[in-house]
Amino acid sequence: MKLYDTLTKTNVDIDANEINIYVCGPTVYDHIHIGNLRPIVTFDVLRRLLEHSNKKVNFVHNLTDIDDKIINQAQRLNLSEEEVTKRYTSAYFEILDELNIKLPKIVKVTDVMSGIIKYIEKIYDKQYAYELDGDIYFDTTRIADYGVLSKRKLDEQISGIRVKSNENKTSPNDFVLWKKTVEGIKWNSRFGLGRPGWHTECAYIIDQEFKQKGFVIHGGGIDLVFPHHENENAQNLALHNKNLVNCWVHVGYLLIDNEKMSKSLNNFIYVKHLIESHNYRAIRWVFYNTAHTQPLNFDGTIIKAAQKDVEKIISTVNRFRTFLIANKNNIPSSSLVCEEFKKALFDNLNFANATKVIWDLIKVLNESIAYKKIDENIWAYQQLIWCLEIYGIVPDMIHNEQIIDQINQWSELLNNKDYEKADSIRNKLINKKVL
């Protein structure tokens, strides 16, 4: 398998039998929007693909549950910070479940605070950090390769930290490792009361979870390349003299009316609202027709088209299941590897080519129904189910005992040429969306 690596700007071979994946999670101060969802769905597909290819996958996902945004939201809602993070963490988990996302290992920042503090102390003791007005800053001038990921010249860069910048820093690119504060939840450290910087939280979790061993893929949105991922990498260079991961995979922007979707622009769509009005499979399908690295313009037409596509897929699967039963076959309980689909996704997650394979299989199933060649094409059904498993959108099995009995009655009536009664049952099956 090959994946495009942001750092080397080349396709990197993913040959290891055990793969470590880390994807930056949300700051749990609000519900996630559809732009937040794209990396989650993309890496869920990658995980499923690797696991279906007999790879062991260690997938870690963080939750940032301390941040100025959380403090501000708590004040707005007249809640404690813990109440805010609990509310939106629970909402996030509900969305992952409703969208059929295989749950990664979740690491909350507050659960690993003692380790983060020790991590900062190590950086400081190696003289890659300095104190300024009570805050601890990472000294980016000590890293010769600073900018290696984002390919930016130092004078083009900005700190991009989530707190107000100090003009007296050694370099404008220096970022906070430890922020002195009297507001909100805080921890004691040798640097005084405060809390860690955002960039350090993720860098520590990756270091702690994977121990600088194995093949590591780091994923996230393209907007995180700089400064977040650049600064994660800088800390690893300081402590271990090596880049943080083996492959950086960044997912393209989601656009609304050709503008980046973001809460700051107030042009976002909450995922929870989409789920209320659309099949979760359609929401996932939106991401399966465009290269994951490219921008995706989201509007009403794209979700409507996805809904229609998914309805066609579900209809074909259910109809084929019905004709399997009518032909006295069992519905296969196992799938078959679809090599063409796998080949497409192994080529840097080529969603366009992979999705074309699905439509080719749909065509085979529809033709097998039309020309009464069900038995000869069971393989196509099994391959289609395998593809849909990777995409996380396998149609539910709605052929219960009652429906199976009706299908058998319908088939028997047709064989006996009792067409009037057969049509009556056929209409019932159509209403149940299995014919």
UniProtKB/Swiss-Prot annotation:
It is found in: Cytoplasm. Its cofactor is Zn(2+). It catalyses: tRNA(Cys) + L-cysteine + ATP = L-cysteinyl-tRNA(Cys) + AMP + diphosphate. Keywords: Aminoacyl-tRNA synthetase, ATP-binding, Cytoplasm, Ligase, Metal-binding, Nucleotide-binding, Protein biosynthesis, Zinc. GO terms for biological process: cysteinyl-tRNA aminoacylation. GO terms for molecular function: ATP binding; cysteine-tRNA ligase activity; zinc ion binding. Its EC number is 6.1.1.16. A motif ('KMSKS' region) lies at residues 260-264. A motif ('HIGH' region) lies at residues 26-36. ATP binds at residue 263. Pfam families: tRNA-synt_1e (PF01406). Zn(2+) binds at residues 24, 202, 228, 232. Binds 1 zinc ion per subunit. GO terms for cellular component: cytosol. Monomer. Belongs to the class-I aminoacyl-tRNA synthetase family. This is Cysteine--tRNA ligase. It comes from Mycoplasmoides gallisepticum (strain R(low / passage 15 / clone 2)).
